[in-house]
Amino acid sequence: GVEQIITVDPHTTYMMREIYPKYIENYDIKVKHYLEILSQKSENLAQFRAGETPEAFVIHDPCVMTRDLGIVEQVREVGGALGIKMVEPENTKMDTACCGGPVEYAFAHLTHQISGIRIGELAGLKSNILVSCPICLINLSRYEKSMGIKIWDMGEILSDLKSC
């Protein structure tokens, strides 16, 4: 049987790690977000550098990843090991502001209001924004053209690593 699942989405990690065990009898699968695993091996990442990426990013912490899972420093550890410079916005880490994505299907207008506030805060610091959640990526990417910014996912950066 399956012993461990590695996820790329904090929402999936939360559901499979925190909710499924409450409802599925004998559920004993270990569930980890990929950044939890990579941060434990960050010394191995030092031999790589991010490929064609900007010099610095403003970091957006996914709300579910930080508040519900406690995954906060891992993205910073992985980014730091790759030589990525990260700028912290005012609302960061456990106090991060949501991108609005989790409520999109029920309250689309509310999602746009929330994401508009968050993207204004982030874009005011840097034009390159780093996320580590596919929902944040999709939700914040809608502002790329109108605001002249670029939203990057950590997985995207990891897929283009170069040896030092």
What are these regions (language model features)?
Residues G1-C164:
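Iron-sulfur cluster-binding electron-transfer modules in prokaryotic oxidoreductases
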